[in-house]
């Protein structure tokens, strides 16, 4: 009988813990209007890093370090990747960032998806939408978004980790203006 009590207690505790994580992540997302952070991105083994600013919904500006002045910008509709020698424009809604940059979408997914604890410190949700699979990671202590993993539009495996996250800062709105073509 005691064995069944412990099993029941463990199941209730685990369910409460999962619900608590979900609620804290959802509340954190609801209270976040923008964030800036450093990032490290691994695309098929090629590592790049830099700094990004996200403004919900669907706006992002990233400057890459040590790379021919590479920037990534979304105004909420289009996504531009620009270097000194190249300029690529994509409809945002055809990229995984369309989902990652939409906090209401993330909130709705977190509500219904099963969480997975990774290494005791990360909370992971796997989102499958429109033939796109994205693993979203949140910090178990702060409940901040701290990364994602997906396959990009070129079928490259992409892992992005965030650090030095700052939320709800005053940001210049013009950083999300799309840059002119080279």
Write out the residue ranges for each language-model feature.
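Sec-dependent N-terminal signal peptides
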Residues: 4-13
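Boundary at the C-terminal end of the N-terminal hydrophobic targeting segment
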Residues: 15-19
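A short, Trp-centered hydrophobic/proline-enriched beta-strand micro-motif
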Residues: 27-47
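Short, solvent-exposed coil/turn segments at beta-strand boundaries
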Residues: 31, 53-59, 74-78, 120, ...
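A generic structural motif
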Residues: 40-42, 63-65, 82-84, 128, ...
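An acidic-aromatic
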Residues: 52-101, 158
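Flexible, surface-exposed loop/linker segments and immediately adjacent secondary-structure boundaries
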Residues: 84-122, 127
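Gly/Pro-enriched, hydrophobic low-complexity segments
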Residues: 109-110, 114-182
